[in-house]
């Protein structure tokens, strides 16, 4: 590059003509960490860990496919003339909301087949989902995508960011806002909050709904800073969906508390309180 700033190599491993990109490595790492955390949460909740493994065997590939389909739908003007690019997810282009939709639908169907509580499953995996999203954003970082508007190097330095982040935000002759980082840090904070509130007297399902509210709230504002938002006419799709999910989640919490009296989070499926560890 003209000013000597070099981006990080997006390729993690090169074996002959076969290359493994950091994007894929980071996404795979996020999945593994999410699985291990979900198994740990299941153990605390006295839930059979095989249920979590069986769920994720289905949910992971379906979520990846739905995330890609979601992205392709809203970028169809490009993909209709580049059909071969649709399967090349290592080039980037998977939407978190698409993945969430796929995961929720899978969990609903799975819970009905297994005759277990969807809300109990959702609560167990909620911390895993948000930390996986925090990690996954670094895949966007390696691909130099999901960034914000143009800015200056001095502004990035004022944030006390390490040089490797600042340099990676230098794209095509300009520096950009590291919105990937803002969202990653927001998700890490959300992860910590979920771990704290799961020990309080919340009702079953509210940990997952709290995750949806927290993530959607942050995503709404961060999305407004991005330059690569998926659009539907004049609307940013993720902002519209964020508002919808916030309202829907709050409405579900209120309705369930008023009409359904759901059990507390720390009660297992037999109604017994699980001892806190």
Curated annotation (Swiss-Prot):
GO terms for molecular function: phosphatidylglycerol-prolipoprotein diacylglyceryl transferase activity. Belongs to the Lgt family. This is Phosphatidylglycerol--prolipoprotein diacylglyceryl transferase. InterPro entries: Lgt. It holds the Pfam family LGT. The chain crosses the membrane at residues 18-38, 51-71, 89-109, 116-136, 177-197, 205-225, 235-255. It is found in: Cell membrane. Pathway: Protein modification; lipoprotein biosynthesis (diacylglyceryl transfer). Its EC number is 2.5.1.145. It comes from Listeria monocytogenes serovar 1/2a (strain ATCC BAA-679 / EGD-e). GO terms for biological process: lipoprotein biosynthetic process. Keywords: Cell membrane, Membrane, Transferase, Transmembrane, Transmembrane helix. The lineage of its organism: Bacteria, Bacillati, Bacillota, Bacilli, Bacillales. The keyword Zinc-finger does not apply. A 1,2-diacyl-sn-glycero-3-phospho-(1'-sn-glycerol) binds at residue 137. It comes from the Bacteria. It is a multi-pass membrane protein. Catalyzes the transfer of the diacylglyceryl group from phosphatidylglycerol to the sulfhydryl group of the N-terminal cysteine of a prolipoprotein, the first step in the formation of mature lipoproteins. The gene is lgt. One of its GO terms (cellular component) is plasma membrane.
């Amino acid at each position: 590059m003209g000013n000597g700033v070099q981006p990080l190599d997006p390729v993690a491993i090169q074996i002959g003509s076969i290359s493994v990109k950091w994007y894929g490595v980071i996404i795979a790492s996020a999945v593994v960490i999410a699985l291990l955390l979900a198994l740990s949460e299941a153990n605390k909740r006295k839930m059979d860990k095989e249920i979590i493994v069986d769920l994720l065997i289905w949910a992971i590939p379906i979520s990846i496919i739905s995330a890609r389909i979601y992205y392709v739908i809203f970028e169809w003007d490009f993909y209709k003339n580049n059909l071969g690019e649709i399967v090349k997810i290592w080039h980037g282009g998977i939407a978190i909301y698409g993945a969430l939709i796929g995961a929720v639908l899978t969990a609903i169907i799975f819970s009905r087949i297994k005759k277990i509580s969807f809300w109990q499953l959702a609560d167990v995996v909620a911390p895993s989902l948000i930390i996986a999203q925090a990690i996954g954003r670094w895949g966007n970082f390696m691909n130099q995508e999901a960034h914000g508007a143009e800015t200056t190097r001095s502004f990035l330095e004022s944030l006390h960011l390490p040089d490797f982040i600042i340099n990676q935000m230098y794209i095509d002759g300009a520096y950009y806002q590291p919105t990937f980082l803002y969202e990653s840090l927001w998700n890490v904070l959300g992860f910590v909050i979920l771990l704290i509130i799961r020990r309080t007297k919340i009702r079953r399902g509210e940990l997952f709904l709290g995750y949806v509210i927290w993530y959607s709230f942050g995503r709404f504002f961060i999305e407004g800073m991005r330059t690569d938002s998926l659009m539907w006419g004049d609307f940013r799709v993720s902002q519209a969906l964020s508002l919808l999910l916030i309202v829907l989640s709050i409405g579900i919490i209120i309705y369930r508390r008023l009409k359904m009296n759901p059990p507390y989070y720390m009660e297992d499926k037999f109604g017994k309180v699980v001892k806190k560890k």
